[in-house]
Amino acid sequence: KSYGWGGLYIGDISQPRGGPRLTGHKSHQIGLDVDIWLKPKAYTFLSISERETVPPISMSKSGGALVNHNWTETHHKVLREISKDERVARIFIFPGAKVKMCREEKGDKNWLRKVRPWWGHNYHIHIRLKCPDDAYKCQDQYPPPKDKESSEERLFKYKQFIGNQLHSI
């Protein structure tokens, strides 16, 4: 709320112990995943029908390789704040947003290691949580790799990938 958003819209969220779901992502079945929309929450309470019909807003263009006019500095700040939470292992978002944040972040960029470029996350971010301390059978993923390439190199590779995908259709 400190960034002028009334809160966050939560999309698919894992069941506490994983398990089958009627709809949604396969990855949301282990109890460690949540989707958060890239849209400022307008007001606190929504009716059931309003929750089902809130329109998503895309933040990307060029097949996810770039951000569009809907992306703001506040999105960047919100993702930085989420990444500071020790319970967060990874944040998945479309590649163009990761590139934009890498270019524009001032100071320590280490938090951006948690932000991973992944297709299909143009309207929302996907958060993977670390295993809770009391979940003795849960195994955390390996820590995110240190970024060895510049954001421009990653963008170039992603544009090549998108171009190859479009040519194969």
Each model region followed by its residue ranges:
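Short, functionally critical alpha-helical segments immediately adjacent to catalytic or ligand/cofactor-binding
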Residues: 10-14, 33, 127
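Catalytic cores and adjacent binding grooves of peptidoglycan-active enzymes
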Residues: 46-169
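Sec-exported extracytoplasmic/periplasmic mature domains
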Residues: 1-4, 15, 41-42, 83-87
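Acidic/His-rich structured neighborhood in mature extracellular/periplasmic domains
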Residues: 15-66
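Solvent-exposed coil/turn segments that connect beta secondary-structure elements
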Residues: 13-16, 39-41, 96, 130-133
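Loop/turn elements at helix/coil->beta-strand transitions in domains of secreted/extracellular proteins
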Residues: 4-8, 32-33, 84-91
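Extended, low-complexity, intrinsically disordered C-terminal regulatory tails
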Residues: 1-25, 92-114
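Extracellular/periplasmic catalytic domains that process cell-envelope and extracellular macromolecules
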Residues: 3, 26-31, 83, 118-121
